[in-house]
Design a protein with these regions (language model features):
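Active-site-proximal beta-strand/loop segments in catalytic clefts of secreted hydrolases
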Residues: 1, 31-35, 207-210, 241, ...
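Conserved, well-structured beta-alpha core segment at the onset of a catalytic domain
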Residues: 1-63, 250-251
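Soluble non-cytosolic domains of exported or imported proteins
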Residues: 4-12, 180-187, 242-249
C-alpha cells in the first residue's frame, strides 16, 4: 500500500497547480477534502457481522483458549508485547452477532516469534496469529469485505471461515489508528487548500461540510432527498466511492453557487432530479 502523501509535498504540489491556474485563468475554485471515512465504502458493512449460535461460538473459543490464556500472557512476561496489546489481541466469540477477527499491521508481528520456543507453533498457525485481533466497534470494515466475510479461505477446508478462523486481511479494514492518520493528513491538506484559496482570491468550497449534510439527514431537492446511504441514498454509485449522475449534479450545483457568489456570475444551477441514480427493482 502507498504511504499517505506528506503534507509539505502536498502543499508544494498544490501551490504549483494554483500558480499555473492563475497564469492561465482569471479565477477558479478550490475544493477541500471531505471526510472520506463517512462515505458508503467505509460505512456500509457493520463491524459486527459474524452470526454464530452458542455451540459454534463455544467451539471457536476452544480453538483460541490456549492462545488467550497461555500464549498472550507469556508474551507479556517476555516483554514481547504490552499488557494492553495482549488485551487487544484476546479473541472471544459469543452467541449472536460478533466482531470478526482481523489482521492489524500496527500490532507487533509475532509470526516468526511464535515459531520459536517456547511456543514452537507450526508456520501456518504462527502466521495466522501474527497480527491477529478481533475488530471493535471503532474499526471500519470496507465495502469489498461484504463478499469475503464468512467465506472459506481454503475451499477444501470447511473450518477456514474468514472472520472466524482466518483473519480478514488488513487491506479490508480501516483501523482506528489508520483513521487517525487519515484525519491528521486531511486536516493538514485542508488547511493548505483553504489558505491557498484565500491567498490567491479564489472561490472556496467546503466539501467536508457538504458531505456532512448528506450523512446527517440528507439534502433536499425537488423530488426527493440525497443522503450518503448505500444504494438508496441516491448520491453514491455501487462502488461506494464515486457519485452517481445525481450526485455529480449536486456537486455541480455546489461549485456553481461558489462561482456565482465569488465572481458575481449568473450560471444557472442544474435540476438534480433530471439526473439518474441507482434504481432498486425486484425484476
Amino acid at each position: 500500500p502507498n504511504d499517505i502523501t506528506d503534507a509539505n509535498v502536498f502543499a508544494a504540489a498544490l501551490n504549483q497547480q494554483v500558480t499555473a491556474l492563475n497564469a492561465s485563468a482569471s479565477g477558479g475554485v478550490l475544493v477541500n477534502l471531505s471526510d472520506v471515512t463517512s462515505i458508503p465504502y467505509f460505512t456500509t458493512v457493520p463491524a459486527q457481522s459474524i452470526p454464530l449460535d452458542a455451540a459454534t461460538a463455544a467451539a471457536v473459543n476452544a480453538q483460541f483458549a490456549l492462545y488467550n490464556t497461555q500464549v498472550l500472557p507469556l508474551l507479556v512476561q517476555l516483554q514481547v508485547i504490552t499488557q494492553a496489546e495482549a488485551g487487544a489481541r484476546m479473541v472471544n466469540f459469543e452467541e449472536g452477532i460478533n466482531f470478526p477477527i482481523i489482521s492489524d499491521d500496527d500490532l507487533t508481528d509475532l509470526s516468526q516469534i511464535l515459531q520459536g520456543p517456547p511456543a514452537n507453533l507450526p508456520p501456518p498457525i504462527a502466521n495466522l496469529l501474527g497480527q491477529l485481533r478481533q475488530a471493535t466497534a471503532d474499526d471500519l470494515i470496507l465495502l469489498p469485505a461484504s463478499s469475503v466475510l464468512g467465506t472459506l479461505a481454503n475451499p477444501a477446508d470447511p473450518l477456514s471461515v474468514i472472520g472466524v478462523a482466518v483473519p480478514l486481511v488488513d487491506q479490508l479494514v480501516l483501523t482506528t489508528t489508520e483513521q487517525g492518520r487519515v484525519a491528521t493528513a486531511s486536516a493538514a491538506y485542508n488547511a493548505t487548500i483553504q489558505g491557498l484559496a484565500a491567498a490567491n482570491d479564489l472561490a472556496y468550497v467546503d466539501a467536508r461540510s457538504e458531505l456532512a449534510q448528506l450523512t446527517q439527514g440528507g439534502i433536499a431537492y425537488d423530488g426527493g432527498t440525497l443522503t450518503s446511504d448505500y444504494i438508496t441514498g441516491g448520491s453514491f454509485s455501487l462502488d461506494g466511492v464515486h457519485p452517481t449522475s445525481r450526485g455529480y449534479a449536486h456537486v455541480a450545483n455546489i461549485l456553481i453557487r461558489a462561482i456565482n457568489a465569488k465572481y458575481g456570475a449568473t450560471v444557472p444551477q442544474v435540476n438534480i432530479g433530471d439526473y439518474g441514480t441507482i434504481t432498486v427493482t425486484n425484476n
